[in-house]
């Protein structure tokens, strides 16, 4: 069994964090005492993943190289790809196909923070012959603000809607995804069809629906704290939480 590799998606303009992101990639902003990118890298590191690619965008490439280098001081091997313009999560993921080379892949959005390790779920995914996609779900008080999933009694995802009105599910789809290498076949097919949304992006939701329609998407409902640090309020609130948890450095070697 090949080891799983990791992808951190760290592009985007960070418009919800303006003016902080006018001259800085949002993933370099601090979450309490560490850059945001340290938190997402730590999620991969905690799962035992050592081979990582970071997909960048915008104008802060040199800052990432200076901060992280090739990853050796963190016990990681870090490589980089560059998304020239905003084209969506699935398009960004397509840039990593040559790096992944047929392996399973754990993908995390660089502004997402997970309090606990998901290693037990990765161990299960690596031996799972039924599902090629794990999506991580968290119950939220206001489902209308998120992409929402529905599960059957076996944990299979049966339905997904983006920011639905008054849904009878409150399970938000977070920014952590496990995929088999089949994800690149689906992305390639979408690229060939030019299946971009009205906002000009190749949507990861459409790729996840392909897995769902084949009965290959599983929902993982987890209990630990999750934060999307994409707004100023969320950045402040999460920084206070991390301070109160008092766990020290998240990224080993930092």
Label each region the model flagged.
Residues 133, 142-167:
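Anionic-ligand binding region
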Residues 116-145:
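Conserved donor-nucleotide/metal-binding helix-loop-beta segment in metal-dependent transferases, i.e.
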Residues 126, 156-253:
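Catalytic-core segments of class I nucleotidyltransferases/pyrophosphorylases
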């Amino acid at each position: 069994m090949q080891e799983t590799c990791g992808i951190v998606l760290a592009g985007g303009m960070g418009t919800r964090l303006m003016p902080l992101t006018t001259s800085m990639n949002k993933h370099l902003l601090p979450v309490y005492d560490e850059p945001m990118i340290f938190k997402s890298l730590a999620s991969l590191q905690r799962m035992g993943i050592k081979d990582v690619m970071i997909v960048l965008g915008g104008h802060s490439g040199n800052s990432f190289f200076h901060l992280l280098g090739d990853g050796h001081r963190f016990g990681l091997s870090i490589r980089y790809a560059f998304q020239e313009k905003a084209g969506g999560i699935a398009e960004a993921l397509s840039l990593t196909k040559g790096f992944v080379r047929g392996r399973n892949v754990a993908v995390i959005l660089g502004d997402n923070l997970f309090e606990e390790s998901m290693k037990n779920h990765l161990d299960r995914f690596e031996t799972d012959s039924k599902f090629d996609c794990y999506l991580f779900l968290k119950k939220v008080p206001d489902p209308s603000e998120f992409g929402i999933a529905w599960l059957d009694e076996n944990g299979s995802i049966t339905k997904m809607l983006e920011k639905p009105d008054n849904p009878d599910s409150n399970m938000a789809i977070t920014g952590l995804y496990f995929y088999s290498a089949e994800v690149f076949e689906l992305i390639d097919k979408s690229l060939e069809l030019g299946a971009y949304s009205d906002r000009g992006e190749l949507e990861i939701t459409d790729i996840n629906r392909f897995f769902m329609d084949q009965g290959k998407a599983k929902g993982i409902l987890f209990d630990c704290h999750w934060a999307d640090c994409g707004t100023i309020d969320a950045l402040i609130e999460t920084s206070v939480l991390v301070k109160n948890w008092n766990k020290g450095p998240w990224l080993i070697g930092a």
